[in-house]
Amino acid sequence: MIDSVSLNRLSGVRQMLRTFGGLNEGYACSEAELTAEKNFSSREFPALVTRKPRAKVRAIPKLNGSYHLNGMFTVEGTSIRYEAEGGAVTTLPNAVTDSEKQLVGIGTKILIWPDKKAFDTATRTVSNLGAAWTSGTGTVEISPCDSAGKTYTVARYGRTEPIDPKDGQMFLKVASMDSPWQSSSLLEVYNAAQEKWVILTLDYCKITATGIGKLFQSSDTITLSGTAAGEADQWEALDGECSLIEVHDNWILTRATPGGTRFYGKLTHTGSTAKWVSLNGNDIVECGSGYAVRLERKIPDLDYLTECDNRVWGCASKENVVYACKLGDPTNWYDYRGIASDSYAVTLGSEGAFTGAATCLGYVLFFKENCIHKLYGTKPSDYQVAGIRCAGVASGANKSLRVMNEVLFYLSLDGVMVWDGSLPQSVSASLKAEKLARVVRATGGTLGERYYLYTTTAANEQRLLVYDTTRGIWHEEDAIGQEMCSTGRQLYLWDGRILWAADPDREETDRETDTVDYELCTGDIGLDTPDDKYLSRVNVRLDALETGVVSLWVSYDGGAWEEAGHAQADEKYTRLNLPFAPARCDTLRLRLTGHGQIALRSIAMTVAAAGGNRVALSVKA
């Protein structure tokens, strides 16, 4: 039998939350997690603290790219600025075009695309990766020569050698008197000491012109074009790609396969005209006009870049090709000589544009939205590219690629992913997928054990999400980070006008800091008790780390926010209590707002449950 005392008896249970999770935008957000927040951090876990104030570094009206290599490198409009770790600053105005850059480091150099330039952090100079030279109105002489670059003339030719030759005498032994200058003839020199004729092999080509070699260096692979060698029928194929054996200011040496009916002679270009003269000077062939000799060290157009094993790797969506530069030499991308230091290129069969490139665990990775291409091997002869269909990098999110603790983080169409050498896995289950799917641009950065991800949508909705990789917790900070640069010791974020340092304690000099405006909303409190109950008392306990006012708000059963109280800290490191007696409800949510620095220590709740089963009671008639 139920009496009136038992029917209305309340049993109180005191509950306390002392371990706080992070952002959970899903339907299953618990009371210890946050449905929404701004500027909180898990750095003092299990307590919930506000992020550190950011240190103002300097104003930058336009930032097209940033990179850290022995110092901070920034592309600001058309200017380059480099601040070495020792503090010396170098500024180079009008060094590049005013466009967004793709940057990668190799050795002491920072490579800049699409400008195809390199900044040397040692010499503080900018140079072009590619080079081109054109003859213009000048004179260019092209002659067959030996490996030392020596050219020869000959006075006599015939089917048989002279009877009484002198030491060093030259002779061209021909197969046909009608075509004496063809490549099948043999150029010979008499050696008196050996008393025999020695054959000279002219399988090199010497190109002489004023200033022709100033832009190039030995071992460069260049593209030679605009010669009259084809019309003169000299060499098997002179125009095309060739490797420079020796380079001087006014002449260069390259290999060239002998061929043609007028091989033994000199080809001279003067302006746009050309003529061929035989080795004895007697036969002359006018080759017409319209020629312009050009030498070019070509650099491919690349969308995304990465460095691995002393090579720069890149991908080009227009060609669907992956490139690698010559070993240790980012100025040469078309050097194919069959050796281990060769350049490398391969066409991929997957559809779609490239969306990013990265290096992780010693592998070069190229991304599309729906696949990852992984490169195996140690040299061009055994390189292999394997593709797997999985969640790749989302379009516009190439700068979200960041490696931390040998794990690669990036934004995909399926959310934020981590790649550890196998298949990518999502770490963004607690974030709303619809928001991430609307992202059109994303950048990433790292600091300590935290991964920072800035996102923006077509409607200019901006967010800065921070993932604690140790605890698997997400937080959200006020949205800056259109450009980020991680140095290992610091993370720099650009808000469109000002460059900020994420952690002022890591800066060597005191800087002006921003004011942290914070806000958090808890999940529904009361869902863990499905029976009749009410909360008789709630006490929020926190530490104010600096002076300020903290406001507490409450929402009953999903209703409007009502202010439940506020507290003021007149001194630093003040412990504050915000108690209140909530109205009768099934569930409630709490909200904290303010500015400054606080640490949420605990939320204590006294829950009373009705003991008489009033709701379930049935009465017989």
Indicate where each model-derived feature is located.
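Short loop/turn segments that connect beta-strands within the blades of beta-propeller domains
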Residues: 76-77, 106-107, 113-115, 183, ...
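Beta-propeller and closely related beta-pinwheel folds
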Residues: 53, 296-443
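Beta-sheet repeat architectures centered on beta-propellers
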Residues: 1-70, 392-396, 403-407, 414-621
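Extended assembly-interface regions of large multimeric machines
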Residues: 1-218, 230-236
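Surface-exposed loop/turn elements that mediate protein-protein interactions on large endomembrane-trafficking
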Residues: 79-91, 119-131, 322-343, 375-383, ...
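Short hydrophobic/aromatic-rich beta-strand motifs
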Residues: 72-74, 108-112, 162-189, 219-225, ...
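Small/polar beta-strand repeat architecture
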Residues: 8, 129-130, 190-220, 225-299
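Hydrophobic core register within WD40 beta-propeller blades
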Residues: 66, 103-104, 305, 357, ...
